[in-house]
Amino acid sequence: LNLEYVLPEDIERRSFEIIESELHGREFPEKIKPVMYRVIHTTADFDYADNLCFSENAVDAALELLKNGAVIVTDTNMAKAGINKTALAKLGCEALCFMSDPETAEAAKLSGTTRAAASVDRAANLGKPVIFACGNAPTALIRLYEHITAGDFSPAFVIGVPVGFVNVVQSKELIMSTGVPHIVARGRKGGSNVAAAIVNALLYMLTR
């Protein structure tokens, strides 16, 4: 075994060099590349080079929202924890997750729905532009779709990367059909770590 001796501060840079090498010269639009590479770096999964889908001018739209202090709402505390708080603070943004709140649990119980869907309803009442970052619950994306098509709430941006088997593929396709600016991982793959990685990639484009 030939170990690489890399200084701690150089590990991320070296990782991105390896990603670049293993993509064998594939070209990606300049705005998309940092997001794509950050997700691959987080997961070590090169499938994202093919299944990560961006709506037209998605990155520009997301960056503009972040520059203007949009609220990021996540569907898991894990995704919220993974978002870089220093970068958030530099831009005057905040990340929220309603999943563990008693109010969310009570609303879900009363309406016979999931806490993820109830979290979306709470996000709809924030009264400010929302970037919804979903890495776990397809029911959150489905509830977003219901709000969008009903015309009563539309998130400013959707990061749709839930992972799993039940309604995961379908929920992502629904979001992609709405016209709302989005970054979606088509298929079954995703996760809270992927949602956080996408948010961080966008934040770093503005703060590093």
Show which residues each predicted segment covers:
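Charged, compositionally biased N-terminal leader segments and the immediate start
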Residues: L1-E30
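N-terminal glycine-rich anion-binding loops that anchor highly charged ligand groups
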Residues: E27-H41
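A short, well-structured juxtamembrane/interface segment
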Residues: D50-L65
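Buried hydrophobic positions in well-ordered alpha/beta secondary-structure cores of metabolic enzymes
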Residues: D75, I159-G160, I198
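Short glycine/serine/threonine-rich phosphate/pyrophosphate-binding segments
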Residues: A79-G82, P138-L144, F165-V169, G191-A195
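Long, charge-dense
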Residues: L88-L126
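ADP-ribose/adenylate-binding Rossmann-like module
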Residues: A156-F165
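C-terminal functional extensions of proteins
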Residues: V166-R208
